[in-house]
């Protein structure tokens, strides 16, 4: 039974990681408000190494539609500005001395719908990942049956437990999706 518990625990942990990855993906997709996590995935070249933006500058929210980026070193201003411009976010930073202001444009209805479509794709990818984890766990359990290490009753119970874990995580994905869709469609 210890092996089965380990398999279930592993499946739950891997599904939690998928759920966290989905939350991070959702955080990158902005709604109408500025938030610092919007720029988290942007990397800049710093002395030959690509590092996250938040390791070379202070990112803060100036107002509901503006982020401010304050580099710790003056020579990083143009590098950071270029990194923000070339990101897939479609933002146009404005530099004022050593402070980079990043105004967020108002989302059009068309862009909102496109973002909802992207959010749904991310959620579906998370669901698929969780189903794959379930499949892997069930396969491992079937291997134990072949090696006669567990009984068929144990197999059935373990597969039911893994299915419950999967259902729970997929429900969480659906809840996150509903919240994010509502957030994106808010005017």
Curated annotation (Swiss-Prot):
Matches recorded under SUPFAM superfamilies: Ribosome recycling factor, RRF
A cellular component term, taken from the record's GO annotations: cytosol
GO BP term, pick one: cytoplasmic translational termination
InterPro entries the UniProt entry points to: Ribosome_recyc_fac (IPR002661), Ribosome_recyc_fac_dom (IPR023584), RRF_sf (IPR036191)
Localization per record: Cytoplasm
GO MF term list: ribosomal large subunit binding
UniProt keywords, alphabetically: Cytoplasm, Protein biosynthesis
Entries under Gene3D superfamilies matching the protein: 3.30.1360.40, Ribosome-recycling factor (1.10.132.20)
Role according to the record: Responsible for the release of ribosomes from messenger RNA at the termination of protein biosynthesis. May increase the efficiency of translation by recycling ribosomes from one round of translation to another.
Family label: Belongs to the RRF family.
Name this protein carries in UniProt: Ribosome-recycling factor
UniProt organism field: Nitrosococcus oceani (strain ATCC 19707 / BCRC 17464 / JCM 30415 / NCIMB 11848 / C-107)
Lineage: Bacteria, Pseudomonadati, Pseudomonadota, Gammaproteobacteria, Chromatiales
């Amino acid at each position: 039974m210890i092996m089965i518990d380990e398999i279930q625990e592993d499946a739950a942990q891997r599904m939690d990681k998928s759920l966290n990855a989905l939350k991070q993906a959702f955080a990158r997709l902005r709604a109408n408000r500025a938030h610092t996590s919007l720029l988290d995935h942007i990397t800049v070249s710093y002395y030959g190494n690509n590092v996250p933006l938040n390791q070379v500058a202070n990112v803060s929210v100036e107002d509901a539609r503006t982020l401010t980026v304050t580099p710790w070193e003056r020579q990083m201003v143009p590098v950071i500005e270029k990194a923000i411009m070339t990101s897939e976010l479609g933002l146009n930073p404005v530099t004022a001395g050593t402070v980079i202001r990043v105004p967020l444009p108002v989302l059009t209805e068309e862009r909102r719908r496109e973002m909802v479509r992207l959010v749904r794709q991310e959620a579906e990818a998370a669901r698929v990942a969780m189903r794959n984890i379930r499949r892997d766990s069930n396969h491992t359990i079937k291997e134990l049956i072949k090696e006669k290490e567990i009984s068929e009753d144990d197999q059935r119970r373990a597969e039911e437990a893994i299915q419950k874990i999967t259902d729970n995580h997929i429900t969480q994905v659906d809840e996150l999706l509903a919240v994010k869709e509502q957030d994106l469609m808010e005017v």
